[in-house]
C-alpha cells in the first residue's frame, strides 16, 4: 500500500488539494452507521501535523441538509500523537482517502501504513460474536452467575443486573441514582459495602466515551467479582470491609446505545443544545468545570473533543459531579475507565505542572501497574495526562484533583496501541483478563492508601 499511497500523492495536480478540501462538503448516499471500506491508517505526526488534525476535525463531517444533522464522518482521529508515541491513527472514508492523503502530503507526511483495510468487517465480526454467544448461553440459575460478564450488553441489561444484585444481596449491594441523561435514561450505579456506616470510598466510573465498550464491561466484571467473592476471597473481603465501593458502569448511556444501534464509533453524548444545526453531543470528559475550555478541548460542536456550551452543560456530568460531591463524604480513590492504549494517567491534564501530591500518586500508580504486570503480564505506562499523553482540560481527573481527592486516575484499558490492535473493537474474550488485572491494580492502590493515609475505621 505504500506505493499506492505515493501514487495517490503524486498523481494529482498541484491545485488538486483545493478540490480535496471542497470534497469535505459534498453530500453522499449511505448510512452514517456503515463503515464499509473505511480504512484505519497510521502515520508519524509532529506537533504541526497534530495541530492540523485538530483544526481539520471541525470539518471532518458530511451533513444532511434535509434532516439537519450529521450524515457520517469523513475521517476520525482514533489515536493522537503523544509523549509515548509519535504516530496518529485516523479512520478515513473510502471516497475521501485520496484527498486526505494529499492533504497529509501538504503537511509533510510521506509514509502512511494501513492498519485496517475495512473497518466494517471488524464491526460485523464483533456483532456476530455477541449474537452467537447470546444464543448459545444457558442460564446458570442464580442472579450473579446468570449475568454474562464476558460479552457486551445493552444498557437495559446492565441496569437490570444492578437492580437484581441489590434485590438478592440487600445487606451488601445498594442501587444509587446518579443522574438522568439527555434522552431521559436513568444513570445508576451500585454501592457495595459491608456496613451502613460511611467509610473511605472507592469510585469507579466508565462509559464516558460511548465507543469504548470494554470500559463499562470491565466495570461490570469488577462489580460481579466483588459480590461473588464477598466472604469467600480474603483479600477482596478485606477491601469491602475497608472501603465503600461505588461502581457507575455507564455514565453516557445515550451515546452508548447510539453506538450499539446506529454508529458503532460514536464517542460523545447525544445532547442537542450546542448551537450547531448538524452536530450533536459533547465530549463528556471535557465538560467538567475546572480549567474548562483550555488546552486539549475544542469549541466546535462538530469536534469529537467538543467541550460543551458551558461547564457541566451535560446532565450526565452535572449529575455525576453532584453525586460525588454530596453523596460520598470521603472519596479517597477515583478511577475513570477508558480505552485504549494501556496507560494509567494521573493529574494534571490541563498543564504540564505536577500536583503537590505527585510523588504519592505516582508511587501508588507504580504499585498498580506492577500488580497488573504480575497478574497478566500486560504492560501499562503511568504518569500524568499532560506528561504521558497530551494536554486535556475539563476532565474529571483534574476537577477532582482540585477538590482534594488523594488518588485519582484515568485508565486507558486494553488493547495496546500497536499495529495489530483491535482498537475500540477489542473482542469480548478480553473482558475477563482486563477486568482481573484492573481489579488487582485497584486493590494495590487501596492497600497503598491504607498504608500511607493511615486510614482508621
Question: What function would you assign to each model-found segment?
Answer:
Residues 13-457:
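M14 metallocarboxypeptidase catalytic domain recognition
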Amino acid at each position: 500500500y505504500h506505493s499506492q499511497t505515493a501514487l495517490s500523492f503524486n498523481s494529482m495536480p498541484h491545485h488538486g488539494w483545493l478540490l480535496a478540501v471542497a470534497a469535505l462538503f459534498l453530500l453522499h448516499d449511505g448510512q452514517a452507521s456503515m463503515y464499509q471500506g473505511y480504512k484505519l491508517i497510521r502515520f508519524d505526526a509532529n506537533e504541526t501535523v497534530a495541530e492540523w488534525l485538530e483544526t481539520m476535525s471541525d470539518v471532518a463531517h458530511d451533513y444532511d441538509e434535509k434532516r439537519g444533522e450529521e450524515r457520517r464522518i469523513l475521517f476520525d482521529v482514533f489515536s493522537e500523537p503523544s509523549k509515548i508515541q509519535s504516530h496518529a491513527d485516523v479512520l478515513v472514508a473510502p471516497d475521501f482517502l485520496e484527498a486526505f492523503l494529499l492533504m497529509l502530503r501538504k503537511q509533510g507526511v510521506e509514509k502512511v501504513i494501513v492498519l485496517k483495510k475495512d473497518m466494517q468487517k471488524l464491526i460485523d465480526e464483533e456483532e456476530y460474536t455477541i449474537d452467537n454467544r447470546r444464543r448459545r448461553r444457558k442460564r446458570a440459575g442464580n442472579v450473579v452467575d446468570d449475568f454474562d460478564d464476558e460479552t457486551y450488553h445493552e444498557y437495559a441489561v446492565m441496569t437490570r443486573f444492578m437492580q437484581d444484585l441489590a434485590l438478592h444481596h440487600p445487606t451488601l449491594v445498594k442501587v444509587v441514582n446518579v443522574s438522568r441523561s439527555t434522552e431521559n435514561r436513568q444513570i445508576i450505579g451500585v454501592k457495595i459495602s459491608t456496613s451502613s456506616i460511611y467509610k473511605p470510598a472507592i469510585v469507579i466510573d466508565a462509559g464516558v466515551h460511548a465507543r469504548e465498550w470494554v470500559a463499562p464491561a470491565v466495570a461490570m466484571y469488577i462489580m460481579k467479582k466483588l459480590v461473588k467473592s464477598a466472604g469467600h476471597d480474603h483479600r477482596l473481603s478485606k477491601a469491602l470491609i475497608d472501603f465503600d465501593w461505588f461502581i457507575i458502569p455507564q455514565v453516557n448511556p445515550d451515546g452508548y446505545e447510539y453506538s450499539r444501534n446506529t454508529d458503532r464509533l460514536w464517542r460523545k453524548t447525544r445532547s442537542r443544545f450546542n448551537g450547531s444545526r448538524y452536530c450533536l453531543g459533547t465530549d463528556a470528559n471535557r465538560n467538567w468545570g475546572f480549567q474548562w475550555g483550555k488546552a486539549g478541548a475544542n469549541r466546535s460542536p462538530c469536534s469529537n473533543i467538543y467541550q460543551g456550551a458551558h461547564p457541566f452543560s451535560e446532565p450526565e456530568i452535572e449529575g455525576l459531579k453532584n453525586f460525588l460531591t454530596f453523596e460520598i463524604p470521603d472519596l479517597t480513590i477515583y478511577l475513570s475507565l477508558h480505552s485504549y492504549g494501556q496507560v494509567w494517567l494521573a493529574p494534571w491534564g490541563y498543564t504540564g505542572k505536577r500536583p503537590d501530591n505527585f510523588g504519592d500518586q505516582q508511587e501508588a500508580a507504580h504499585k498498580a501497574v506492577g500488580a497488573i504486570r504480575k497478574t497478566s503480564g500486560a504492560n501499562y505506562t503511568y504518569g500524568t495526562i499532560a506528561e504521558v499523553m497530551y494536554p486535556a482540560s475539563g476532565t474529571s481527573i483534574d476537577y477532582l484533583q482540585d477538590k482534594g481527592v488523594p488518588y485519582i486516575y484515568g485508565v486507558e484499558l486494553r488493547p495496546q496501541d500497536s499495529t495489530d490492535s483491535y482498537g475500540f473493537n477489542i473482542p469480548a474474550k478480553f473482558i475477563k483478563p482486563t477486568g482481573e488485572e484492573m481489579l488487582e491494580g485497584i486493590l494495590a492502590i487501596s492497600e497503598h492508601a491504607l498504608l500511607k493515609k493511615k486510614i482508621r475505621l
